[in-house]
Amino acid sequence: MRVGCCLLLKPLRQRLCTASISSRHIMRWCATSSSNINSTETAAKMPDDDVSGSLSAPSLLKYKIEPSTATMGAPRPPHDDDRAFCTLASFPPSHIRNVAVVAHVDHGKTTLSDAILRRTGVLSGSQVGTYTDRLLVERERGITIKAQTCSIFVVWDGEEFLLNLIDTPGHVDFQYEVSRSLSASDAALLLVDAAQGIEAQTMAHFHMALDRGLTILPVLTKMDAVLSDAPVDRALQDLEDSTGLLRREVLFTSAKEQLGIEALLHAIIERVPPPTGLLGLSDLQQLPPLLPGSAERVAMEEKMVPLRALLFDSWTSECGGGLRRPAPRGGEKVNSGNDNDRNLICLVRIIDGTLTAKTVVTFYQSQRRCEALEVGIIHPELRPTAALTAGMVGYVVFSQVRGEEFLVGETLYTLPTRKFARENIVPVPGFRRVQPVVFAGFYPDEGEYITQLREAVEKLRVNEPAVTMEPLDCPALGSGLQLGFLGMLHMQVFQERLLAEFGQRVLVTPPLVQYKYREAGSDEEEPLKPLTVHTWKWIHEGAACYLEPYVTATIITRREHFQAIDGEALRRFRGEQLDMRVLDDARVLVRYKMPLADLARGFFAVVKSLSHGYASLDYGDPVYEEADLVKVDVLVQKSRISALSVICLRSEAPSIGKRIVSSLKSNLTRTAVDIPLQAMVGSKIVARETVKAYRKDVTAKIHAGDISRKQKKWNDQKKGKERMARRTVGAVTLDQSILAAAMGAISL
């Protein structure tokens, strides 16, 4: 298995170096290697290994960085129209490189990607901001949410290469984006902040790339922010100890200062393996006009190969994150199949064959046949091309395909001639589909219709395939949707995108994790049944036991913050410490076994607060264990409010019920009769409050006399209230503001 240029089994003592390095020297080398960054003729030479005594050369000896003897030519100039791209000749696989950029949160992935785009001429120097963060929510939050692809043309040593760069998110909630991006890549740039070193998501992404057999190029970023040698030495030592990647393989960059970019591009061309695949035409309509049965046509048909392509992302024009075709030069109108808002745009990696417009492809799983209206690359907008050939990453437009009719991860194929059958097609190894871990009900805002919300969610799910959807019906809130997400941040981002891209304001119920139960009399091998407040079964109704999801949470934090985090994890979040390892003089790694419900309830926010933002957290797939669960129902005037039902531990039911009824009491308007508020577990009341009725002062005119005169008035008033309560028909009206306040009490 290839991991960069190192062997993981090589003894560590053979890889350690004894010299010291100054980050000032590294930055001076970066400046030297990029001194001609604006030159369109040649790239600067790196210093030779036999130089000694200079400020730039001795520090490089420690890392064994090979000097670059290649020259970088002028980048392909940007085009104002699509005509040059429509005639783009196919690149041989030997001149294609597919690379994904992965790293922990805020380690400089997007900034480095933008620096590469500017250095290669894809973006102009006047464009400010992070270009690959296209979504409004990405720019507002300052994080990458959707993986973005861009094709780059690089001329090196007189040869033109096509680099497909994929910028990925770093947050744990968006690992599905990273997984899909790695499936379409041949290598991964593993970025590490030189000042912060390896974090939890760094290792998660490293193992994800390692499992796929990808080449890994380690890169230290933000070198301009390093003020001493210690952080660099510590980061390099962490890389060796944790990943086995050699120091001499590490590349140094400063995207902010545009330093080290050429050396990085050279390393991508030299060290990333080219894609493997079969070249050839894949559909009869791709053949030139020849007489049927002619020797030339028969010879060309013999050389045809079936198309195989991996579909790893999709969107519609309404939720494409700003990806559009650029305006043609001179206001010309270019006809394209991408003009219809209902068309589906898919990102594909071509494994074998050729894909062109008008090619009819088949989805391997659903067996649905669709005609490609347009194909092209992203540079940095949608640029139509004549074809996509083996090894290339690009987009394909289909006409009015519903999102639920295909799955991201599908294999697209063709059978060009009769000698090929479906049995000859080997599906492209895609990526493991993930299961949602957090569920919440989405209800339309007052005055909105559920149909509009459902249509908006369906369109957004085309771009968010990890989100699941099921219909809901609540007497208090009306019709809604139960959506499943990969985490709390994923849910919040989805809600913000609904508002920003479709104008849908929604009421979101408290998020719950996926509980399960085992039916009575079932075998251990039988799959567990999902358990929600709508499908709840008591033990006497056929449930043998209930199960709760647990995860292993990995935290990397500074040593001075460990005690505070450990105390909170054990006291408030039912954590169980599995092990603790000292990484270096400043940091420790600790692993906890913790219920997923407690982690989603705010554990990560507490960790960030206690560590002043310096801790990182990662967690794996949930494992289900038995738990004493109950369902808490809330009754308002003896009518059950299903939107406020919640599943929790039996020991927590009284406190949760008390918070809910107290919130209702504080927000409900008093009426002429008492309103009882009850929280029940089965038939047992675990919490109760009463909204007292308004009372008229019936003794206001009685100023003297015996107390019995007042008591008679009070008794008459009490009997009247009882008669009024018996005549009351229907339940108390709860508007969404009252329900939202009560739902907020559940999440405390």
Curated annotation (Swiss-Prot):
Residue ranges of domain tr-type G in the record: 94-276
Enzyme class, top EC level, equals hydrolase
The transit peptide extends across 1-29
The reaction(s) annotated as catalysed by this protein in its Swiss-Prot or TrEMBL entry are: GTP + H2O = GDP + phosphate + H(+)
Where is the protein found, in the record's own terms?
Answer: Mitochondrion inner membrane
Q: Which GO terms describe its cellular component?
A: mitochondrial inner membrane; mitochondrial matrix
PROSITE patterns recorded: G_TR_1, G_TR_2
Q: Which GO terms describe its biological process?
A: positive regulation of translation; translation
The Enzyme Commission number assigned here is 3.6.5.-
The superkingdom of the source organism is Eukaryota
Q: What does this protein do?
A: Promotes mitochondrial protein synthesis. May act as a fidelity factor of the translation reaction, by catalyzing a one-codon backward translocation of tRNAs on improperly translocated ribosomes. Binds to mitochondrial ribosomes in a GTP-dependent manner.
The record's comment on protein family reads: Belongs to the TRAFAC class translation factor GTPase superfamily. Classic translation factor GTPase family. LepA subfamily.
What's the protein name?
A: Translation factor GUF1 homolog 2, mitochondrial
What is this organism's lineage? Eukaryota, Discoba, Euglenozoa, Kinetoplastea, Metakinetoplastina
